Amino acid sequence: MPLNLNKKHKELKTTFNPFWSAAVVNEKNGLKNLKKAWGIIFKVLKVAIFIFLTIVGLWGCTQTLAQPWTGTNQLLGSGLEIGYNFGTTGDYRYDLQSNNVGPYFTFSDYTLAYGPFYGWFVWPASQIVLPIMYATRVPLGSGPELGFNMILSLIVLLFLVRLITIVITLNSTLALEKMNEVQGKLAEINAKYKGALDLQSKRNRQMEIMSLYKKHNIKSSASFVQVFVTLPIFLIIYRIVTTLRPIKAIILFNFWDLSKVPLTEIFSNFTSTGWTFIIFLIIVLPVQFISQKLPQIWASKRNENAKAHSQKSIEQLNKTKRMQLIFYFVFAVITAFSAAGVGVYWFLNALFTLLQSYLTHLFIVKRRTRRRLTYSKLEQMLERE
């Protein structure tokens, strides 16, 4: 009975205002056009940001080859250094001064003289690390600087970076989750056109896959977005770790000189300090590997009840694993051949990755549980009716 009253009420309302339907249609069309316009603007803006980040990344990679002052130098007081003007603090670890060995370039105030990459990105990020390190330092003459101030400053910087990029990384993870959820339907489409070599069948298969992705709001490019963002961030922090004067002056835990290159020390000064860097690599490299492996294990647990994967998706999964192994090998080489401060950054970054991946895992599991409860409640309501 209430349903009939509602229908009558709607009919009376429509009869009373004959222009109501047209107004609603116009309003919906206006909202649709506005949404479409915002979508186009957002896509253009996103493409512009990706192009900008790509240029920044390439600039950061090639600048060392083009300009002599961008080459990092392990010696304190050599190469390009970021710190305070000479005489500002009275602490040789923070005040910029040359050791008169080789070329020396100071970066104590904002300038674009060293290029936009340093001026726009490296300098602002260094002004987060440098004040924290100075405020939490062990004063000269009060004991050895064990490096806790550097660890604290890098944790703050990494936290801010993760806070900025969490939307991107979360979207990338959720996109992969959606891809896993539709693997069963994707396998059905591939099985449907298995052995079909004609052009029309290939087009139909591609259209059905695109329709499936669109239905579930899956963007195949989402997994690559993180790479575009990660590379410039790595280059920025790499430059900070290798050019910030107080980091070059630290002997971490009175054990590892962060200005030294692990592999060089192992082969040239093994009996004195080189052997300690073997321990350094044994600590840093496995943590980096675990930070890549554990998220895969968590993802497998989340999707262990999923339908069978298609042959193509299995090949894609194996390809992703191979790429991750290549990336890990590259990171291991960079850690071994760069100043030890870079290894400390990788270690802390790996811990952040593990924490963020675990929180994302919990978020996805909780969201799935909530969805299941919602679906079960709807089914119960339908059964009662």
Swiss-Prot record:
One of its GO terms (cellular component) is plasma membrane. It holds the Pfam family 60KD_IMP. One of its GO terms (molecular function) is membrane insertase activity. Keywords: Cell membrane, Chaperone, Membrane, Protein transport, Transmembrane, Transmembrane helix, Transport. The keyword Nucleotide-binding does not apply. Signal peptide: none annotated. PANTHER family: CYTOCHROME C OXIDASE ASSEMBLY PROTEIN COX18, MITOCHONDRIAL, OXA1. Interacts with the Sec translocase complex via SecD. Specifically interacts with transmembrane segments of nascent integral membrane proteins during membrane integration. Belongs to the OXA1/ALB3/YidC family. Type 1 subfamily. Required for the insertion and/or proper folding and/or complex formation of integral membrane proteins into the membrane. Involved in integration of membrane proteins that insert both dependently and independently of the Sec translocase complex, as well as at least some lipoproteins. Aids folding of multispanning membrane proteins. This is Membrane protein insertase YidC. It comes from Mycoplasma pneumoniae (strain ATCC 29342 / M129 / Subtype 1). The gene is yidC.
